[in-house]
């Protein structure tokens, strides 16, 4: 049976916890996991490739959700060929450096309202390499687009009001406006953001740093010295600013977002524009 083959190839039964006494119950649990995960892996006719849908009954493939689920659905179960197709699917509709965060329920138009989906793609690629070591696939099919995404984030992305760019003062990423929601907190009421997070969001900059380190690693692997130096420089600058600006010593936590505040009077006192929950 297909389910038994997938279980055997995945090696999941070898991960039986030492304190889990009922081996048969664990095997049944693994089978249920395989069956359940299969329901989210679908074939997209428009691309002739597999993709991951975000949920039932009506969600299609959402960039953020699909890429978060990527390792658990495909890599742990060793479905590497399908994993490659999902990565290729994510790349097909990239526009101005943005991976679509979803598709319209009417007509299937790509929606670009996410600052993190493109950055999550880098982590998915990194995990794929950890499981497969197939650097040739990444080099031949994904790397050029990954490089383009980084360049767009640096130079600026205006598509659909995303307002994403690198602040050259601190090498952190700014995203959004007071009218847009392009992080995971994307709820709106009457087109007004419920939790405005425009500015420098903590997870966006953590993912940005991660993406830069992954690009540094790839350039090191392929002996691209100039690229290695460039991405290391950007990552080091980002890390320094992140540690300095995002840590809240009073609450011993990270600030959630650093707002962009424009002072009318340059001599006015600086306002603490950092927010924690």
What does each model-found stretch correspond to?
Residues 21-42, 80-91, 167-180, 239-244:
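An acidic intrinsically disordered interaction segment
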Residues 101, 154, 158-167, 209-277:
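Catalytic cores of carbohydrate-active enzymes
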Residues 40-44, 90-97, 156, 245, ...:
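A short secondary-structure junction motif
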Residues 178-196:
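A short, charged helix-loop
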Residues 56, 99, 173, 184, ...:
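Short clusters of hydrophobic/aromatic residues that line enzyme substrate/ligand-binding pockets
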Residues 50-66, 105-118, 190-206, 256-277:
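Solvent-exposed loop and edge beta-strand segments that line ligand/cofactor-binding
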Residues 1-59, 135-137, 147-155, 219-221, ...:
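Acidic/polar, glycine-enriched structural segments that form the non-catalytic walls/loops
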Residues 60-66, 70-177, 181-182, 202-205, ...:
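Aromatic-rich carbohydrate-recognition surfaces in CAZymes
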């Amino acid at each position: 049976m297909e389910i038994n083959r997938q279980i055997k190839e995945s090696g999941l039964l070898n991960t039986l916890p030492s304190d889990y006494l009922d081996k048969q119950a664990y095997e049944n649990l693994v089978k249920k996991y395989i069956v359940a995960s299969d329901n989210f892996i679908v074939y997209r006719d428009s691309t002739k490739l597999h993709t991951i849908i975000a949920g039932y009954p009506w969600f299609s493939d959402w960039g953020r959700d699909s890429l978060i689920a990527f390792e658990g659905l495909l890599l742990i179960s060793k479905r590497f060929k399908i994993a490659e197709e999902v990565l290729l699917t994510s790349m097909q509709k990239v526009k101005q450096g943005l991976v679509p965060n979803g598709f319209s329920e009417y007509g299937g138009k790509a929606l670009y309202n996410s600052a993190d989906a493109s950055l999550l793609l880098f982590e998915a690629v990194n995990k794929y390499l950890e499981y497969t070591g197939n650097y040739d696939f990444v080099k031949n099919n994904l790397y050029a687009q990954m490089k383009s995404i980084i360049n767009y984030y640096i130079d600026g992305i205006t598509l659909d009001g995303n307002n994403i760019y690198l602040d050259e003062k601190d090498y952190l990423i700014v995203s959004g406006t007071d009218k847009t929601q392009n992080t995971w907190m994307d709820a709106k009421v009457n087109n007004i953001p419920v939790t405005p997070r425009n500015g420098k969001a903590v997870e966006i900059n953590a993912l940005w740093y991660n993406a830069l380190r992954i690009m540094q690693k790839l350039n090191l692997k392929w002996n691209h010295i100039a690229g290695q130096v460039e991405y290391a420089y950007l990552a080091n600058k980002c890390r320094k600013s992140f540690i300095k600006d995002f840590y809240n010593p009073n609450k011993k936590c990270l600030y959630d977002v650093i707002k962009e505040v424009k002072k009318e009077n340059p001599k006015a006192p600086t306002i603490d524009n950092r927010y924690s929950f």
